[in-house]
């Protein structure tokens, strides 16, 4: 693979562009500080403003989210797996 092709598939952490209107709940108090990142693939964003970092077809999506303390994520469901990795801070997960 040529270096130019590799660069098309490289996203540096410092270059991630967040979307603060990715989902309908981003407009509600308590959820309005979330940042959504679509890293590989189009993801599940509901916003035309969402920046897709790597839009080359892969057959999967990788995204990320950032939220300050006490910021809520509304209950929702997926037909695919959703996996959480905590990179920093303290998180509490609840569902049901």
Regions found by a protein language model. Give the residues of each.
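Conserved short histidine dyad/triad with adjacent acidic residue
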Residues: 43-49, 61-78
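A short beta-strand-loop-beta hairpin characteristic of the jelly-roll/cupin
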Residues: 77-96
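A short, N-terminal "cap"/entry segment at the start of jelly-roll beta-barrel domains
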Residues: 1-59
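Conserved hydrophobic/aromatic positions in well-ordered beta-strands
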Residues: 38, 63-65, 84
């Amino acid at each position: 693979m040529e270096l130019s092709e590799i660069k098309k598939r490289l996203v540096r952490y410092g270059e991630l562009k967040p979307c603060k209107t990715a989902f309908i709940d981003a407009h509600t108090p308590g959820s309005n500080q979330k940042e959504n990142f679509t890293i590989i693939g189009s993801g599940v964003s509901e916003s035309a403003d969402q920046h897709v970092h790597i839009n080359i077809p892969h057959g999967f999506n990788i995204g990320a989210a950032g939220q300050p303390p006490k910021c809520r994520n509304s209950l929702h469901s997926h037909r695919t797996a959703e996996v959480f990795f905590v990179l920093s801070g303290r998180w509490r997960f609840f569902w049901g």
